[in-house]
Amino acid sequence: CIQTLGHLMKTLRWGYANDMKDDPDVLLIDEEKTYVFIEAMIKKWRTLCKTDKIHIGMDEAEGVGLGEYFNRHGYCDRYEIMLRHVQRVNDIAAKYGFKPMMWSDMFFKIGSKKRDYYDLNAEILPSLSEKIPTDASLVYWDYYHHDVELYKTMLKKHKEFGRNIIFAGGAWLWRGLCPHYDKTFDTTLKALSACDDEQIKSVIATMWGDDGGEVSRYTMLLGLQLFADYSHCDKLNVENTKENFKLCTGYDADAFIALDFDNIQAKKKDALATSKQVFYQDVLLGLFDKNFAEYDLEGYYDGIIDKLGALSNQGDIEYLFEYYRYLAKILKKKCHIGVKIRRAYNANDIDELLKCADVLSELSDDYKEFYKKLCSVWNRENKLFGFEVFEERIGGMLMRFKSCGEKIIKYCRAETERIDELDEEILWYGDENSKGELLSEHFYNNMRVF
């Protein structure tokens, strides 16, 4: 699975790509250097694998035709531009013996007045859809919806292209620090029910690694079992999948479900990143503290600790459960520390502030130990590349624990008149509709104030 149009910002930022990018994230269509680049990728993959299947991507290329392409050619029909590109890439794939599949969203977005993939009123012109190569499969990706009828309607609209249709659903582990089984089960059961009704023969389970890929792939084995069951079960249900999971792996399905820390009964259905927000938010700036204060998160994480503590040794994956037991203890200790610090500061409660400073010192030690456990999990499952992201993030947290603790102690000793961060009013995270809610924000950069 590669990208041959968008999602290429990390490589297009380098100088070699200056002549072949439409915008910072999207390749420049009709530029010959673009196709030399794409052919080099596909040729390399031909030497690395035996399969005849290749996913050529092309999703979320929102800027296609609107950047350097526009500068060179003026505004052109973006559908026509896309189709020319698809044909060129398809021909390259065929040259190396591959049968390509591609994401379908750009065809819907271009045909939607709202530029919305899931716009049921998007116009797909037969005269254009007929130009999609007949041997290219279209992949409908949808990880979000909880409505069988919506999935069925979208599948029917895909069939209008007259090409082989594949469905890609989500085995959710790309938000927060934990797998998301509640979301996975509900979306997948409904999506695959629709696929069954619409006679879709091929499905894909995606496990994206957004924002660093913090969650172990092995925590989502049970989700993969649910997708696997689609190939041989008449009707899917979670209880049957649990039995099949035990049969196939020997593992306890309920133990895996217990790792879903973020299945908090909040007003917002997709409050999926609380663990990550708690772990990374600054203890004095309190970006999420006003939202967190509405919930007994300490009690919630205490329940998680009890639940995981009651699980017997999980054999060769016990290392994962040891990691999550430790994470739960950190989250319990840290979830309301910012609220407590601010409350004590506003009340000029010096004794309580000093206790909070001690907690920050404890958290510093806890994060150092957590780093060791995270390193162990990562090295079991991944190459080393990418782990530097967590070293930088956790290293930054350690420096802030030290700095914030020192500020509190200096204030308590009357060595300074104020703590500037605590003199500022904290706000609700999000918009007016987010008051009192836990939120799904999961990007690290959006957990920083500056």
Regions found by a protein language model. Name each.
Residues 1-3, 58-59, 104-106, 208:
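Short, well-ordered beta-to-alpha junction loops that form the rim of enzyme active sites
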